[in-house]
């Protein structure tokens, strides 16, 4: 007899967490860096839309996204001019651009303009004049925010991001989504394959318009948060006071080896979080994310030990 594992408990665990994350994001009381950053970008999109929509407004949007999401376009020469020219060529009105992005998401093989824009074209140059390469992460973030302006769109657009890519495999393992799903933070796959992988995961988690956020918005919020835990980087998950409380609780404020070494501090934070401390913060959603991350990590470790 073939024995099949029942992953329904794990799936339900994530679904309950998604509901809490969704409520937290839309709550007027939410004051973490993630929500604040997202709202700032959306305000820029709204004030630069409609009659104000032009190539200059697109460039402004790209600069703000790049700055807040640290996609590092500013290290290139002339990337935003190239990117804004490409996006503006999709249509002279936002409605045209939104429609093309939606068509690409639904039938990616049929909208070559966006496929080539995200996957093939290069933007900006290096100091020596050589091409600086593509901008997949920034462009998917732009598409993500662009579709959020359409209140009738319940699906949204997935962000191609190292945190999401890094957590895709362990989450698939946790919910029993098997098959060839090799994806990591360093993977560079085409946008169509990435779209299909995220669609499949969203279906497995039964994300189908049942949350107050778009489908890909809530999926990205979940993967991003788990990725932040895995990096030991909580600055955008907490407000300043909560973050300082966490540092003090783990006595990292006494760490003097190298105060400017952010990576080292992140590693120490992660190590302390792995010990499973509870009730360090009076923040229910953070506590729930923390516990789930420990469950997720335990699943990963168990599978690795069995191999």
Set out the residue ranges of the language-model regions.
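Catalytic DNA-binding helix-loop module of base-excision-repair DNA glycosylases/AP lyases
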Residues: 119-170
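Short, solvent-exposed secondary-structure capping/transition elements
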Residues: 74-78, 149-158, 176-177
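Helix-hairpin-helix/helix-loop-helix acidic hairpins
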Residues: 54, 67-134
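Generic structural signal for hydrophobic core residues of well-folded globular domains
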Residues: 66-72, 87, 118, 142-147, ...
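Phosphate/adenylate-binding glycine loop and adjacent helical scaffold
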Residues: 62
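Surface-exposed cleft-lining segments at the edges of enzyme active sites
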Residues: 101-105, 151, 181, 185-186
């Amino acid at each position: 007899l073939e024995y099949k594992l029942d992953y329904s408990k794990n799936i339900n665990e994530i679904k309950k967490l998604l509901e809490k994350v969704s409520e937290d994001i839309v709550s007027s009381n939410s004051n973490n860096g993630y929500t604040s950053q997202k709202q700032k970008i959306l305000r820029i999109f709204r004030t630069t839309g409609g009659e104000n929509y032009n190539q200059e407004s697109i460039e402004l949007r790209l600069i703000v996204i790049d700055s807040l999401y640290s996609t590092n376009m500013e290290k290139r020469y002339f990337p935003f001019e190239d990117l804004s020219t490409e996006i503006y060529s999709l249509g002279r009105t936002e409605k045209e651009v939104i429609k093309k992005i939606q068509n690409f998401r639904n039938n990616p093989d049929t909208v070559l303009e966006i496929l080539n824009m995200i996957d093939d074209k290069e933007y900006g140059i290096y100091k020596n004049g050589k091409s600086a390469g593509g901008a997949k992460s920034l462009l998917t973030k732009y598409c993500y925010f662009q579709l959020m302006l359409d209140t009738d769109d319940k699906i949204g657009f997935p962000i191609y991001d190292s945190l999401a890519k890094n957590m895709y495999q362990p989450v698939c393992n946790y919910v029993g989504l098997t098959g060839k799903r090799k994806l990591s933070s360093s993977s560079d796959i085409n946008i169509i394959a990435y779209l299909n992988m995220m669609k499949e995961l969203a279906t497995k988690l039964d994300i189908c318009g049942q949350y107050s956020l778009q489908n890909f918005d809530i999926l990205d919020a979940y993967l991003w948060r788990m990725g932040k835990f895995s990096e030991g980087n909580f600055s955008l998950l907490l407000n300043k006071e909560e973050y300082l409380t966490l540092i003090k609780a783990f006595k990292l404020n006494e760490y003097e080896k190298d105060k400017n070494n952010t990576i080292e501090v992140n590693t120490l934070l992660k190590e302390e979080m792995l010990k499973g401390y509870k009730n360090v913060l009076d923040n229910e959603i953070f506590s729930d994310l923390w516990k789930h991350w420990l469950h997720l990590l335990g699943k990963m470790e168990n599978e690795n030990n069995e191999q």
